[in-house]
């Protein structure tokens, strides 16, 4: 499982011109799922995400997490996080899990993030062609892969 985290001033997801979800200051999280992913990946990344100290404290040091600043979280599925560009110029998405596997894992990930945050999170719509708008804050962008323990 891969997540791409962006600290935002605000973010929203629309589908076909209709607003689906919007948040104020917090985190926009894109999530890509592989067939081998499971509950351990969900719990590890959901917990890590909500504990990342990437918000400034009173001294301007990134020392606070999203919970401490009262931030919101928007979770959006994105299978292209598993793109392979090793061969040729057309990305391959063979590592991305099929919908039958990834949809329930995405839903469980969003629920797990909500549990770790202590409140419901905003989401995109799995499998939809979404328009995502955001205002980066910093910018702060962090990539975490559950298979790489860095």
What are the roles of these predicted feature ranges?
Residues 1-92, 97-100, 104-150:
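N-terminal, polar/charged subdomain of small-to-medium soluble alpha/beta proteins
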